[in-house]
Each structure stands twice: as C-alpha cells, then as structure tokens.
Amino acid sequence: MVAISEVKENPGVNSSNSGAVTRTAAHTHIKGLGLDESGVAKRVEGGFVGQIEAREACGVIVDLIKAKKMSGRAILLAGGPSTGKTALALAISQELGPKVPFCPLVGSELYSVEVKKTETLMENFRRAIGLRIKETKEVYEGEVTELTPEDAENPLGGYGKTISHVIVGLKSAKGTKTLRLDPTIYESIQREKVSIGDVIYIEANTGAVKRVGRSDAYATEFDLETEEYVPLPKGEVHKKKEIVQDVTLHDLDVANARPQGGQDVISMMGQLLKPKKTEITEKLRQEVNKVVAKYIDQGVAELIPGVLFIDEVNMLDIEIFTYLNKALESNIAPVVVLASNRGMTTVRGTEDVISPHGVPPDLIDRLLIVRTLPYDKDEIRTIIERRATVERLQVESSALDLLATMGTETSLRYALQLLAPCGILAQTSNRKEIVVNDVNEAKLLFLDAKRSTKILETSANYL
C-alpha cells in the first residue's frame, strides 16, 4: 500500500542544491486534480495526464464535500491496474486540504485476530470524521518581570515553610499587571521551568500555565542557545483568546475508553502493563455522539465529515459489506471512497455470488461509480517524462519513446520502475542522459510479468 500522506512535496525538483537527498514515493508528482476555476480538467496539470472525465467527476465530489452535502455517500473508483485510482484519491485529499480528515486503508487491513473486522471498520469511520472545537478563554499573557513565592508557617507545625501564594508580574505591549496566584499554579510554573524573561500565558478558568518561549529582548544575551525567542505579546495582559482545536471522533472514543486508574497499587501496576487492543463499545460511542451533538447545538463545535478511502475493496467479505451498508445510513458518517481493479468476480465470503468489482449488488446500487481508462502511448510517454523530472533523471527522446512502447506492451508501472535502474546504468557509463542502450540493458536485467510467465511455462518441469 502506498502511504497517501507520506510525501506532500518534493523540494529537490527545483532546488539548486543538487546534493540534497529527497525521498520519492510512488505519487510524489501528484499535486491536485488539475482543474481550472470552472471545474474543467486540463490534459496535463497537477501531476495528472489524461483521465479527464474521472478528474472532473472527482472535482464535483470535492465541491460537494466542501459544501457538506456528501456525507454518508460512497464513490467507487473502478478501472484496471495502473490507471490512477490511488492517485485520484490522493488528489482529492490534497484538494480538501489538511483540515479535512482523510483516512486511507487497504481492504486487508480490516482483518485482525484481536478485534472484529466490523469494529476495525467503525474505528476508521470515526477517524474520518473531524470535530472542530472553538472555545473562548480568558488568559493572562505576557513577559515575566517578577516571580516571587511568598512563604508562610507550616499549619502542621514544625520548622518547615509552605508557599502561601505567588506574586507574578506580566508585561505586554500595552501595559503590565501583577497577579497573586494560588500555590498549585506555582507547581505548574515550576514544571514549565519558567524564569524571569520568559513569555507565558495562564488560563484564568483552569490555572493552566504554558511557557511560549523566551522574550526576544534577551536574544543577544548568549552567542549560542537552544531557546526559542518570541516577541512581546501585543495588546493587554488580560485578554480573551479564541482557541480552535481539531480532533476526530475516534480520538474522543479512545480518550473516554481508557480513563486513568486510581492511586492504589493495583491500579498503578495495571497501568504499567502494555494495554491490549480492545473494542470500543457501541454504548460509549452513543454517549460520545450525545456530547458532540450538545456541543454542536451550543455552537461550540463544528462537525467536519472527512473521507475514508478503502483500496482493494474486493478484499472485503460479505459481512463487512453488510455492516458498511448500515454504517453509511448513520447520521454521522464520512464520505467513503472505494477502489477496485476487478471486473465480474465472486464476492468474498460467498460461493456463488458473482458481482461487478467484487461488491454486492445492494451496495453497488448506492455507489457513484467513477471509471478510469487505460492510458494511450502519448499519455504514457508524458507520464514517464514527468516522472523522470521528479526523480531528476535526463532521458533522451528515443529512450522515452522506447519506454513508452514498453509501457503500452507490458504495464505503466514496469516502465516507471525501469527509470531508476536506467539512471544507474547511465551513470556507470559516465553519461548524464539515459539512452536506448541503457533501456535495453535494464530490460534484459529485469523481467516484466509477461516475459516471466512465458519463462515459467517453458520451464514448468524444472521449477
């Protein structure tokens, strides 16, 4: 499986530093769907070549997701191998941006010994649903100018002293303020290792202390220092601050499913043991949903339906498909994008149910199907040329034509995978450009699937 979120950009393509080493993944060249303002796909744009209808259909889906009119629906990307199904799913995630949850997985990931497959599916469903919580907090923010703990006699007697309160002076761009804080807040200040000259903020309601960094007025104090310097906070010391936090429903489920234990010895020993992966009950999820609904009604939170991408959907069995039907009808559901490279095939878990793409007929009826078409020779040549640019390889025109022909006769993946070996062979011959001889030599060294099959057929008695 290609990790969809692994490489978002390749700064080495246009970088002047030729010595920089950048990792190139299978879909590094994909930057988006490549649509104009009216939603029409350009032939070569955003890392895509061709697939005009499929890209325009995905563009409509992206608009529906942004308008929040697509939740609880499902799309099927259907097409042969090497036709860009995973690339389309990656492009959808990039068009939606980082704030919209995107959860990719392969059909075989749902099978586990410890947890039911339907439970794993529901976990990924909840991972693909985001919750944006907006909270207005009263905070005191500024540079620490005074930090004085006040001692008092120990009420229990003896010679020891206790902290009765703490005097903290804070300075901002518009004034200063002196605060008298509780001793428990002083413990938080000590944990954050706050000293005079640090910029901190203190939440008025909870008393939580956060050290932001060192004031930039002290930047010239040392020649070398590991501190992060921040400017003096603007405005008054006492202010109202809006804090936005993005979480998923699965995060809330896990937080409530694993409460902290008590202080007794048995509870502490239990926390030391490695927790086994367990199922989250439906009752707990319903309670979380009630709290989420309450926050939404109060205007504190906003629900963000994301995208759940399931590749190789033909690997799912009839039980998961039945559960998927039910999950799609839920009032809290993400957009589900499925991908399959199979035609008419038997549904897994059945003996005689043959259905398109390995998906049962009742689920097929719910899907919007987007078809991806095989690439022609010119499109394969353009893809190989762009891929060579991403991998910083120079290929002469005749070698590109030969690779395009091989991609047409065998597969696009085989032609793309030959690029790196061809580059090594060209370097071995002290050439900066890949030529036809390099391609032919790499072809002899590495077999494609068709030639490998022929060899096995002729040597069946030997192997």
Curated annotation (Swiss-Prot):
The protein's location, in the record's own words, is: Nucleus
Question: SUPFAM superfamilies, alphabetically?
Answer: P-loop containing nucleoside triphosphate hydrolases
Q: Which residues carry this modification: N-acetylvaline?
A: V2
The record's EC number reads: 3.6.4.12
| Residue span of region Disordered | 1-20
Question: InterPro entries from the entry?
Answer: AAA+_ATPase, P-loop_NTPase, RuvB-like, RuvB-like_C, RuvBL1/2_DNA/RNA_bd_dom, TIP49_P-loop
Give the Gene Ontology MF terms in alphabetical order.
5'-3' DNA helicase activity; ATP binding; ATP hydrolysis activity; DNA helicase activity
Residues binding ATP: G79, G80, P81, S82, T83, G84, K85, T86
Reactions this protein catalyses? ATP + H2O = ADP + phosphate + H(+)
Signal peptide residues on this chain, from the entry's feature table: none
A Gene Ontology term for the protein's cellular component? nucleus
Reading the lineage from the top rank, the first entry is Eukaryota
Q: Which GO terms describe its biological process?
A: box C/D snoRNP assembly; chromatin remodeling; DNA repair; protein stabilization; regulation of DNA-templated transcription; regulation of transcription by RNA polymerase II
Q: Where are the transmembrane segments?
A: none
Q: How does it assemble?
A: Probably forms a homohexamer. Interacts with RVB2 and may form heterododecamers with RVB2. Component of the SWR1 chromatin remodeling complex composed of at least ACT1, ARP4, RVB1, RVB2, ARP6, YAF9, VPS71, VPS72, SWC3, SWC4, SWC5, SWC7 and SWR1, and perhaps BDF1. Component of the chromatin-remodeling INO80 complex, at least composed of ARP4, ARP5, ARP8, RVB1, RVB2, TAF14, NHP10, IES1, IES3, IES4, IES6, ACT1, IES2, IES5 and INO80. Component of the R2TP complex composed of at least RVB1, RVB2, TAH1 and PIH1. Interacts with SPT15/TBP and HSP90.
Q: Which family does it belong to?
A: Belongs to the RuvB family.
Protein name per its UniProtKB record: RuvB-like protein 1
- Gene that this polypeptide is encoded by: RVB1
